[in-house]
Design a protein with these regions (language model features):
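Catalytic cores of secreted or luminal carbohydrate-active enzymes
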Residues: 340-368
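Acidic/histidine-rich catalytic neighborhood
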Residues: 122-189
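Carbohydrate-binding/catalytic loop surfaces
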Residues: 2-14, 57-81, 136-155, 251, ...
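Active-site core of glycosidic bond-cleaving carbohydrate-active enzymes
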Residues: 13-45, 110, 167, 174, ...
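Carbohydrate-binding surface patches
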Residues: 375-404
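Inter-helical turn/loop segments and adjacent helix faces that build the functional surface
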Residues: 29, 98-111, 171-184
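Helix-terminus loop motifs that line ligand-binding clefts
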Residues: 1-7, 33-93, 99, 105-110, ...
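Conserved small/polar residues in nucleotide/adenosyl-binding loops
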Residues: 429-436
């Protein structure tokens, strides 16, 4: 799916990581058959991704292109394109989410495991165990989602997503080894793969390095982020504050401590179960001060994380900006087409943000809230063949199983099991904002 869908000629119809991180999660929960077709596209372009990995010096594995229309890299500026290795982990994340939400083990056997193995192999080759970092595994000269900080060492988002890519690959191989040994043997022969590779993958998972600022108790976006000159927006003329690359030399931009879009915060949204709420709050507070939101992919993510930490007023502000981005033409580029990923991010801001939906370790979770500006909202989700309707009002949350024999999920940690036609109702409790 192109970044503009079929609405305009922006980006020439090219396909980016936006699809896996923003659009696919929506389709996985609403139209899983369509989601599977989008994953099929990535499987179909594995040969080109393998070729790309060889061009970049990796003798094993596959490296997906950052920008493509036919499976080959279409970006000509490698610092903002090819250096975004996180595309591999983004695809792995979307694939793993699909498998958890649908329970489609056949897809894992037929195509999914091959994608996970080939993407993991690149992570096992691109970095090194650095003595200067206490033997931790470091990944240098990459670009994260933030396009104002490029070719950095140990981008937090990249390292986090790479580790989870490796973890998912290990899990897939272990599953095949126990439940589908014939499929594992087929992959071993096809990919010249050995389960002995898992030893290195596990070591990297254990020793992955993450930059950390002890004084502020936050995770910097990369090793050099805290050394850069603070950005003073007040010194920038209003007419030059939009897309900075149009007005300033890249070196000027890269030497300042600011972020174009959600980067580390995006990682904390996707894997919020790996961090405490206080950790997420400290990082949110820090990055809110340095993020310019010059990308359409940013405000929806900050809104979701604001929900996670109880900042509902800020969450609604960010949601409104996302929802009205094309209507009000915030970025002055609607003429080129809609921002499809932002539209999907707006859906996520409601479902994953206000309703607190997550699927982690195969468990569907809810943490419902409601903005004070709304009386109620509702949506439907598909989960392992079941169709669940969720309706949230000022004082309660209702969950009704419309289709499917049975569904289990948790609401603020309490397990709920519904049979077809049944409804579960609970009182809505919204904690006071930590800002109050």
């Amino acid at each position: 799916m192109g970044a503009k869908g079929l609405s305009g000629e922006g980006y020439e119809g090219h396909y980016f990581w936006d699809t896996e991180m923003y659009v696919l999660p929506v389709l996985i929960f609403t139209e899983p058959e369509t989601a599977r077709k989008l994953l099929d596209y990535r499987y179909a372009t594995l040969p080109q991704a393998r070729d790309r990995a060889r061009i970049l010096g990796h003798m094993k594995g596959a490296l997906y292109p950052w920008r493509t229309i036919n499976g080959e890299e279409a970006s000509t500026y490698y610092p903002l394109g090819t250096a975004q290795y996180h595309i591999n982990a983004d695809i792995s994340y979307a694939l793993s989410l699909y498998l958890q939400v649908t329970g489609d083990v056949d897809y894992l056997k037929e195509k999914g495991a091959e994608i996970l193995i080939e993407t993991a192999r690149v992570w096992a080759d691109v970095g090194s165990f650095a003595e200067c970092k206490g033997g931790k595994y470091c990944i240098c000269d990459v670009t994260g989602p933030d396009e104002y900080n490029v070719l950095v060492d140990n981008n937090f988002y990249t390292n986090l997503m790479a580790r989870e890519n490796l973890r998912d690959a290990v899990g897939a191989v272990e599953y095949l080894k126990e439940h589908a040994p014939e499929d594992l043997k087929r992959l071993e022969e096809k990919l010249d793969f050995s389960v002995e590779e898992l030893g290195l993958w596990r070591e990297i998972i254990e020793k992955m390095y993450f930059p950390y600022d002890e004084k502020r108790q936050v995770y910097p976006m990369d090793d050099g982020f805290m050394m850069r000159k603070p950005w003073d927006e007040n010194k920038i003329p209003p007419e030059k504050r939009a897309w900075l690359y149009e007005n300033y030399h890249p070196l000027f931009i890269m030497r300042h401590r600011m972020s174009k879009q959600a980067d580390a915060i995006l990682g904390m949204y996707l894997h919020n179960d790996l961090f405490t709420e206080e950790e997420i709050r400290r990082n949110y507070d820090f990055y809110q001060e340095v993020t310019l939101h010059h990308s359409s992919l940013s405000t929806c993510i900050f809104g979701i994380v604001a929900c996670d930490i109880g900042y509902l007023d800020e969450a609604y502000k960010y949601f409104s900006q996302s929802a009205r981005m094309d209507l009000d033409d915030y970025h002055n580029n609607f003429y080129a087409g809609i921002h499809a990923a932002n539209m999907a991010g707006t859906w996520q801001a409601i479902v994953n943000g206000f309703a607190g939906v997550r699927c982690q370790n195969g468990v569907l979770k809810f943490k419902p809230t409601i903005p004070k500006e709304w009386e109620e909202y509702a949506f439907r989700l598909k989960f392992k063949g079941a169709l669940l309707e969720v309706r949230i009002t000022k004082d309660k949350a209702e969950f009704t199983l419309l289709e499917g024999g049975e569904i289990s999920f948790t609401v603020r940690g309490k397990e709920v099991v519904l049979k077809s036609g049944e409804t579960y109702t609970c009182l809505l409790y919204t904690s006071p904002s930590p800002r109050d």
